[in-house]
Amino acid sequence: MENEVLKAIRERRSIRRFKADQITDEELKTVLEAGTWAATGHGTQEPFIIAVQNPEICAQLRKMNAEIMGVESDPYYGAPTIVIVLAPESNVNGVKDGSLILGKMMLAAHSIGLASCWINREDGMFASEEGKKLMKDWNLPEGLMGIGALALGYASSHPHTVKPRKEDYYRIIK
């Protein structure tokens, strides 16, 4: 069976090399809106999606993430846009909800010709005092945790062909 959605799922790859060119507002809004259509437990829509294009704030996020990772390189691979997903610490489905949002946004990005890569360590970043200050500056409520982020932009190179899926990846029990 084949259709546009299944084709996009099979073709999307994590990209780790980005052009410096900023994406358009229309492209950004398309990706962000796709995230809002992700399923959330009990339909709560509690996560927050924060797109950062301000160069100074992006630099701060890169530094925070790199410090947690213990590297000096850019954990966001030079992407001009960083999209952060946060969820209430009190929501038992927060990580699941935020993960679905990130997945939908990655698929949407691919479908309109953008590149993305899931980035980790936002949990540690936004548990820190520096992260809490950023959330306050962004007028977000207290009690949020970082779920993950996307490096988002135009690919400067494309990955090699994908390896085949392992044969025992799924099982059908009848």
Segments predicted by a language model, with ranges:
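Acidic, surface-exposed loops and disordered segments
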Residues: 1-174
